């Protein structure tokens, strides 16, 4: 089908090439033969008057023109998908929809476990692909590579809808044998003790606790860096190191792991965890239903603090 001289099928090919960066992989992803994909590239080059891609080894490298076209092409295809193709009534009981969700290990353990258990009973055909927060949320949402991103609201994109799920707060934790945590921590003690910290992604981006601590002038001597908060408690055992962690996760580990919990030398404000979805998914029936499930489960979460033993 042509629209003003452009074969619209070529947009599907261009999107696949930008995503896969390989002629073979792109052809396979949209059920084309490799010769057919090569022909599509030739036609795209003719229409746009640009090479669009060059080869570096086996990888396709997009030209500036291809990079500029990519977001508009992806937006157009997603708009067609969610406003025309997918506009069927969604029945969660019968659906086999698989939701792709990016979230931290914290929310995986303290929140999403509830969602998975509930839907195993109520909508057993629903599946999930749960992935770590390793990339820029803006990019993930813009290209529709995820159905949802669950992250601290401070880091949410301003270009896509969001909804608050729950509040959390930060506390200091250590091994029960850590004598320095038997008394109120001073700024000096907190800064001089060895810390274990979480950083995320390939570039080890600072986590929420690092952002809040720096924002309020609290500095740490970080001795160990791990790629997620859930790896911290076992590494505290038998050491005098401490860590700053979300209280809900501390509550989760306190059921099985001995921890000494202390107040930070400066009371930090609570922070919110939020869910975001691509703006083009806003009217998608499956997305709407899943949002409702997430918000309902968040409402059932009790406020943190009551179940953790603060040991003097």
Curated annotation (Swiss-Prot):
- Does this UniProt record's set of keywords contain Transcription regulation? yes
What upregulates this protein?
A: By flavonoids.
Q: Which residues form the HTH lysR-type domain?
A: 6-63
A molecular function annotated in GO for this UniProt entry is: DNA-binding transcription factor activity
- What's this protein's function? Represses the expression of the nodABCIJ-nolO-noeI operon.
Family per similarity comment: Belongs to the LysR transcriptional regulatory family.
Which protein is depicted? Answer: Nodulation protein D 2
Organism (species): Sinorhizobium fredii (strain NBRC 101917 / NGR234)
Q: Which gene encodes it?
A: nodD2
